[in-house]
From Swiss-Prot:
All copies of domain Thioredoxin, residue ranges: 36-174
Entries under InterPro entries matching the protein: AhpC/TSA, Thiol-dS_OxRdtase_ResA, Thioredoxin-like_sf, Thioredoxin_domain, Thioredoxin_ResA/DsbE_sf
Annotated Gene3D superfamilies: Glutaredoxin
Keywords: Cell membrane, Cytochrome c-type biogenesis, Disulfide bond, Membrane, Oxidoreductase, Redox-active center, Signal-anchor, Transmembrane, Transmembrane helix
Descriptive protein name: Thiol-disulfide oxidoreductase ResA
Domain of life: Bacteria
Subcellular location: Cell membrane
Similarity comment text for this entry: Belongs to the thioredoxin family. ResA subfamily.
């Protein structure tokens, strides 16, 4: 009787394992991936900033947008934030907006980070990772350079120097 129970249990485990493998293969090979690519239109979204104001990407049409995905725990993100903050007022006057998308952290953590670095550009929080997933963001930081027409011009993964950020901001001036 025990041998039969073990056989049934092993068969059930094997079936569950095969179903999981089948599902993984199906989702990887047969479902459409909607990764954002250079030359494509940036997916629109609405997120709320630390002050409670809504930011809709499409509201920035006519401006260049430096769309930066980041986290408070991300050391490379921490290194580039002061550079972004320093360049923000200069390029804002020239029609370029910096919009930092925090990836689902508690508002209090993000506020403390912003206060610590004196950040002045808009910071929005993607609480359910919907925007993160829509843009198919992998490692942080990841930045999308979006032109005045809403087209993705470049995707940068990894930390940037001040010179890199300045060059990229220049490239999306309207």
């Amino acid at each position: 009787m025990k041998k039969q129970q073990r056989l049934v249990m092993r068969t059930a485990i094997l079936l569950v394992l095969l179903a999981a493998i089948g599902y993984t293969i199906y989702t990887n090979f047969f479902t459409e991936k909607t990764a954002v690519a250079v030359g494509s239109t940036a997916p629109d979204f609405v997120l709320t900033d630390l002050k409670g104001h809504e930011h809709r990407l499409s509201d920035y049409r006519g401006k260049g947008v430096f769309l930066n995905f980041w986290g408070t725990w991300c050391k490379p993100c921490e290194r580039e934030m002061p550079y972004m903050n320093e360049l923000y007022p200069i390029y804002k006057k020239q029609g370029v907006e910096i919009l930092a998308v925090n990836v689902g952290e508690p508002k209090l953590s993000v506020e403390k980070f912003a206060e610590r670095f004196g950040l002045t550009f808009p910071i929005v929080i993607d609480r359910q990772d919907q925007v993160l997933n829509a843009y198919n963001v992998g490692p942080l930081p990841t930045t999308f350079l979006i032109d005045k027409n809403g087209e993705v011009k470049q995707i940068i993964t990894g930390t940037m120097t001040k010179e890199d950020i300045e060059r990229h901001l220049e490239s999306i001036k309207p």
